[in-house]
Amino acid sequence: MIRVMATGVFDILHLGHIHYLKESKKLGDELVVVVARDSTARNNGKIPIFDENSRLALISELKVVDRAILGHEGDMMKTVIEVKPDIITLGYDQKFDEAELQSKINKLGITVKIVRISKYDGQLNSSSSVRKKIMELIGERY
């Protein structure tokens, strides 16, 4: 069985997230989605609207997702060790250096393939584009 691990904040769920998860699932038999902790999101400059447990609950309900978990605070490698993925997928906009990530994982003695998933071409394909649209709509109303 090929286990795929997809990670993200998944705040304001949108079609870009669905694309990322569906494309990730196509690469294996089991999709494990790791939802970033609130503290991790904040440390990366993002302020989630939904708290980590709400985001985990939303992701868990998606039929493409086999299992959803919260990531470890401060150490992604602990999550990699726990999940034992064959493949880790990255979103088009995730700020990971693939070679550096591969090196860190190799040092743990784990063999993992890293795959960057393409951008969803539709409108409102990122949380920031959804937030921008909301601000435009609010500005028009008030």
UniProtKB/Swiss-Prot annotation:
Cofactor: a divalent metal cation
Catalytic activity: FMN + ATP + H(+) = FAD + diphosphate
Pfam families: CTP_transf_like
EC number: 2.7.7.2
Residues holding ATP: V9, F10, H14, L15, G16, H17, D93, Y120
Signal peptide boundaries: none
Annotated metabolic or biological route of this protein: Cofactor biosynthesis; FAD biosynthesis; FAD from FMN: step 1/1
Keyword tags: ATP-binding, FAD, Flavoprotein, FMN, Nucleotide-binding, Nucleotidyltransferase, Transferase
Gene Ontology BP term (one): FAD biosynthetic process
Broad enzyme group: transferase
One Gene Ontology term of the molecular function aspect: FMN adenylyltransferase activity
Top-level division of the source organism's lineage: Archaea
Family: Belongs to the archaeal FAD synthase family.
Subunit (UniProt): Homodimer.
HAMAP family, A to Z: FAD_synth_arch
Purpose of the protein: Catalyzes the transfer of the AMP portion of ATP to flavin mononucleotide (FMN) to produce flavin adenine dinucleotide (FAD) coenzyme.
Protein name per UniProt: FAD synthase
Organism name: Thermoplasma volcanium (strain ATCC 51530 / DSM 4299 / JCM 9571 / NBRC 15438 / GSS1)
Gene that specifies this protein: ribL
